Curated annotation (Swiss-Prot):
GTF2I-like repeats lie at residues 103-197, 352-446, 457-551, 562-656, 724-818, 859-953. Residues 241-341, 661-714, 816-836, 960-998 are annotated as: Disordered. Homodimer (Potential). Interacts with SRF and PHOX1. Binds a pyrimidine-rich initiator (Inr) and a recognition site (E-box) for upstream stimulatory factor 1 (USF1). Associates with the PH domain of Bruton's tyrosine kinase (BTK). May be a component of a BHC histone deacetylase complex that contains HDAC1, HDAC2, HMG20B/BRAF35, KDM1A, RCOR1/CoREST, PHF21A/BHC80, ZMYM2, ZNF217, ZMYM3, GSE1 and GTF2I. Interacts with BTK and ARID3A. Interacts with isoform beta of PRKG1. The modification Phosphoserine is found at residues 19, 103, 207, 210, 214, 412, 517, 668, 674, 722, 784, 823. The modification Phosphothreonine is found at residues 556, 558. One of its GO terms (molecular function) is mitogen-activated protein kinase binding. It comes from Mus musculus. Residues 690-711 have a biased composition (Polar residues). This is General transcription factor II-I. Ubiquitous. Residues 328-337 have a biased composition (Pro residues). It is found in: Cytoplasm; Nucleus.
Length: 998
């Protein structure tokens, strides 16, 4: 801030306070300009005097010079005082005629206009994320009023240039300036596009409305989708980080996150950069968020990180880089302090508006590029751009005039900030084509770049080509090291197994040598750029000729490169053994006993664990990452199980172990372990009366959950977990979704009241009964089978949900049958035989399962659907096992295949049927898959973490068998708790939370 020195100037009255603020504001702007001049190595010193204040601004050296020469300041102040006195005397001598009064009013109104204009410039600069003054484009704002919204103007005052305001309006604006703010919705449209952009303008106007409320915190997860038409299933995504490359090519489109507002703030130009209150970064940089605290990164380039849950607090979207972060009035100094930047991270987010906005921006940039490219090749009208050619021949084909730090790529790979900056610089953009013959030489590249192809296809084509180029480069350099002129295949595994005797020099910094299939696009590009200096060093050529077994698993030869999946599997097994042994000691047993984790979680008062490392709760080892597992192993001596009520766990023990427990601790008499007389074995009753039955007994069934039941306070992933709160929340959400479905079903029938949905009918006849408007990736089924994220997504999307009933008569018949089946009261058979049996086990909770005869046909259809899912799952498991070289079916990691596109390709699927888990497939699709079973084939393009491919015979390395099986199991344990598993018993569906330990 400028230095202020108090002088002895005569004080003015309080009317000058407004002008004082304007002067302070302008001096701050002057100081920002001096900082920019200092970056150009120009030195500036400035002394300003206003009333009783002396301002000293300038560069660091300039201020130091002025502060040492106090005589300069005194002389300047003295001169200003004398001139002020002369002006006052002359003012007294002049007569106050009407003309003079009018001139005074003109000066005043001009001053106020200047003040308002400067404040508008300050607000506009603040909306752009800058601390400097930015000129307001009044003409563009008035022409395209939906691009920039001005809030806080006094009621009845429209936004326009200050020169069009009268004196009273100007004063009124200055009095209410504390609430004035600019919000930039999108870049300005060109005039010709603005005339036809009614839809976009209407959308932008809707986005101006502030939300009437905000929804509660939403835990979501993300899966990659395609191009700009993306419909992210969740709001955030977990991906790897390549911090060394600022222009990492990301085929996966992320919704704005908390880091977007910080990392994507780039200046419009260096001249207006100023001092930013947040660090500038690159929008392409991806952030890795581990599921456990301080979990290390997977060493491979293609690693998949554990999924994370992101909480989004609000439901309205405003551009991250343009939104006014604080609704509080600005402080008296108009320039915001950098210290406040950290407090302005709360933003409202609405994916639909964000998606519409980024789609429109990408379309504009795509049209701009095509128009500029057509001008370069002298073609008429827009022309499709061969992006791969521009990326492969950067010296002969390139683009000039792009904003600094933005590489030329397909617009679908840019985020909103870069798209806006490109549009602002559209006049300077120019395509340079030095070799026109390149545009017609490579037809393969043009075929790979079809306009209809999505981001995934483009990414796959690009990375495949780059890997091929790098592999050819390595083969050539490897042959040179061996004294050969012909390229030779590189034994990558041997280089990894013997890093001291076989290695490569000249690779870019922080890039290890390995097979090109492990590199991402940024590293591949860097390797190609330094291809001339790459050199293979072979100290022991004999290693290349011997086929040793030690290279069959190169990633596990050294501790540094040990496979992550094998390592975490071993640690989990070790911790599991520790827990089992400690649990047995607590029961007074000598042999290890498997811990019933759900029982501990459900009874934390009577069953808990002491001595765990600080911050680590007690739960199944499959929930822990490597850091926590290692901490538990190191502190295993302190761990102690406390069992206050052994009767809670006795039913979970093996039959031979129960009799060895000290019976004094039991509160109830010991009973035989036979199934018919053991009171400790609870039996569950389920009464199935119809497809929509929801009996009290069903709701009372306790299912094992993966929640925390330890008495040790902890905060998993930053929040303290409460099973009661979670259970209450999911129960409430399920009820809301069920009520919503019932209301929509009634609307489809033309009724005002809600109608209970016959889910079995919808599942059995999907062509005649179906639901439209559900969020992408969410199938229609009972609300009880959904987790919290999907329930919340359904409620957010409730306005679009619509039930389609093509055969109302069949629907009414099903409703009547369901009603008639529920009308008679349930009768419990009281035959003498039953009474005799019940008398022997009076304390058992035995309940009959009653199935009305009318529902048998419907239940058989549901059973057929479940059988189809099992058959499809078995088919996929068998095909996947064949693809990875196994002779037996292997559980398919559906989620990992989905979030690692390009790693595993599934061919032979029926037309119109995409590959996904069987639980998400329609009945008709599953039948078509089974009909095409012989054509379906899994192909592993490149491995991903958790996938172990056995290319050797099983008997060559028998020790790999258990590891592979465990890793296959471990790869499935990464699925979050919120994944729905639908269990169908008759027509009633009971959601079971996955329990990897039982």
């Amino acid at each position: 801030m400028a230095q202020v020195v108090m002088s002895a100037l005569p004080a003015e009255d309080e009317e000058s306070s407004e002008s004082r603020m304007v002067v302070t504001f302008l001096m701050s702007a002057l100081e920002s300009m001096c900082k920019e001049l200092a970056k150009s190595k120009a030195e500036v010193a400035c002394i300003a005097v206003y009333e009783t204040d002396v301002f000293v601004v300038g560069t660091e050296r300039g201020r130091a010079f002025v502060n040492t020469r106090k005589d300069f300041q005194k002389d300047f102040v003295k001169y200003c005082v004398e001139e002020e006195e002369k002006a006052a005397e002359m003012h007294k001598m002049k007569s106050t005629t009407q003309a003079n009064r009018m001139s005074v009013d003109a000066v005043e109104i001009e001053t106020l206009r200047k003040t308002v204009e400067d404040y508008f410039c300050f607000c506009y600069g603040k909306a752009l994320g800058k601390s400097t003054v930015v000129p307001v484009p009044y003409e563009k704002m008035l022409r395209d009023q939906s691009a920039v919204v001005v809030q806080g103007l006094p009621e009845g005052v429209a936004f326009k240039h200050p020169e069009h305001y009268d004196l009273a309006t100007l004063k009124w604006i200055l009095e209410n300036k504390a609430g004035i703010s600019f919000i930039i919705k999108r870049p300005f449209l060109e005039p010709k596009k603005h005339l036809g952009g009614r839809v976009l303008a209407a959308e932008a106007e809707r986005s101006m409305l502030s939300p009437s409320g905000s929804c509660g915190p939403i835990k979501v997860k993300t899966e990659p989708t395609e191009d700009s038409g993306i419909s992210l299933e969740m709001a955030a995504v977990t991906v790897k980080e390549e911090s060394e490359d600022p222009d990492y090519y990301q085929y996966n489109i992320q919704g704005p996150s908390e880091t977007d507002g910080v990392d994507e703030k780039l200046p419009l130009s260096k001249a207006l950069q100023g001092s930013h209150h947040s660090s500038e970064g690159n929008e392409g940089t991806e952030v890795e968020v581990p599921a456990e605290d301080s979990t290390q990164h997977v060493p491979s380039e293609t690693s998949e990180d554990p999924e994370v849950e992101v909480t989004i607090e609000d439901d309205d979207y405003s551009p991250p880089t343009k939104r006014l972060k604080s609704t509080e009035p600005p402080p008296p100094p108009p320039v915001p302090e950098p210290a406040n930047a950290g407090k302005r991270k709360v933003r409202e987010f609405n994916f639909e508006k964000w998606n519409a906005r980024i789609t429109d921006l990408r379309k504009q940039v795509e049209e701009l590029f095509e128009r500029k490219y057509a001008q370069a090749i002298k073609a008429k009208g827009p022309v499709t751009i061969p992006y791969p050619l521009f990326q492969s021949h950067v010296e002969d084909l390139y683009v000039e005039g792009l904003p600094e730090g933005i590489p030329f790529r397909r617009p679908s790979t840019y985020g909103i900030p870069r798209l806006e900056r490109i549009l602002l610089a559209k006049e300077r953009i120019r395509f340079v084509i030095k070799k026109h013959e390149l545009l017609n030489s490579t037809r393969e590249d043009l075929q790979l770049d079809k306009p209809a192809s999505g981001v995934k296809e483009e990414w796959y084509a690009r990375i495949t080509k780059l890997r091929k180029m790098v592999d050819q480069l390595f083969c050539k350099k490897f042959a040179e090291a061996l004294g050969s002129t012909e390229a030779k295949a590189v034994p990558y595994q041997k280089f990894e197994a013997h890093p001291n005797d076989l290695y490569v020099e000249g690779l870019p910094e922080n890039i290890p040598f390995r097979s090109p299939s492990w590199y991402g696009i940024p590293r591949l590009e860097k390797i190609i750029q330094v291809g001339n200096r790459i050199k293979f060093v072979i100290k022991r050529p004999e290693l290349l000729t011997h086929s040793t077994t030690e290279v069959t698993q190169p990633r596990t030869n050294t501790p540094v490169k040990e496979d992550w999946n094998v390592r975490i599997t071993k640690l989990r097994k070790q911790v599991e053994e520790i827990f089992n042994l400690k649990f047995a000691q607590a029961l007074g047993l000598t042999e290890a006993v498997k811990v019933p984790y759900p029982v501990f979680e459900s009874n934390p008062e009577f069953l808990y664990v002491e001595g765990l490392p600080e911050g680590i709760p007690f739960r199944s080892p499959t929930w822990f990452g490597i850091p926590r597992l290692e901490r538990i192993v190191r502190g295993s001596n302190k761990i102690k199980f406390v069992v206050k009520k052994p009767e809670l766990v006795v039913s979970y023990l093996p039959p031979g172990m129960a009799s060895k427990i000290n019976t004094k601790a039991l509160q109830s008499p010991k009973r035989p372990r036979s199934p018919g007389s053991n009171s400790k074995v609870p039996e569950i009753e389920v009464t199935v009366e119809g497809p929509n039955n929801s009996s009290p007994q069903t709701s009372a069934v306790r299912t094992p959950t993966q929640t925390n039941g330890s008495n040790v306070p902890f905060k998993p992933r930053g929040r303290e977990f409460s099973f009661e709160a979670w259970n209450a929340k999911i129960t409430d959400l399920k009820q809301k979704v069920e009520n919503l479905f019932n209301e929509k079903c009634g609307e489809a029938l033309g009724l005002k009241q809600a109608v209970k949905v016959p889910f079995a009918l919808f599942e059995s006849f999907p062509e005649d009964f179906y639901v439209e408007g559900l969020p992408e990736g969410v199938p229609f089924r009972r609300p009880s089978t959904f987790g919290i994220p999907r329930l919340e997504k359904i409620l957010r999307n409730k306005a679009k949900i619509k039930f389609i009933i093509k055969k109302p008569e069949m629907f009414e018949t099903a409703i009547k049958e369901s009603t008639s089946s529920k009308s008679p009261p349930r009768k419990i058979n009281s035959s003498p035989n039953v009474n005799t049996t019940a008398s022997g086990v009076e304390d058992l909770n035995i309940i009959q399962v009653t199935i009305p005869d009318d529902d048998n046909e419907r239940l058989s259809k549901v059973e057929k659907a479940r059988q189809l899912r099992e058959q499809v799952n078995d088919l996929f498991s068998r095909k996947f096992g064949e693809a990875i070289g196994m002779g037996f079916p292997v559980k398919v990691p559906y989620r990992k295949i989905t979030i690692n596109p390009g790693c595993v390709v599934v061919d032979g699927m029926p037309p119109g049927v995409s590959f996904k888990a069987p639980s998400y497939l329609e009945i008709s699709s599953m039948r078509r898959i089974l009909d095409s079973a012989e054509f379906i084939k899994f192909t592993v393009i490149r491995p991903f973490p958790g996938l172990v491919i056995n290319n050797q015979l099983v008997d060559q390395n028998e020790s790999e068998g258990p590891v592979i099986q465990e890793s296959a199991e471990a790869s499935q344990l990464e699925v979050p708790v919120t994944e729905e598993i639908k269990e169908t018993d008759g027509s009633s569906q009971i959601k079971q939370e996955p329990d990897p330990t039982w």
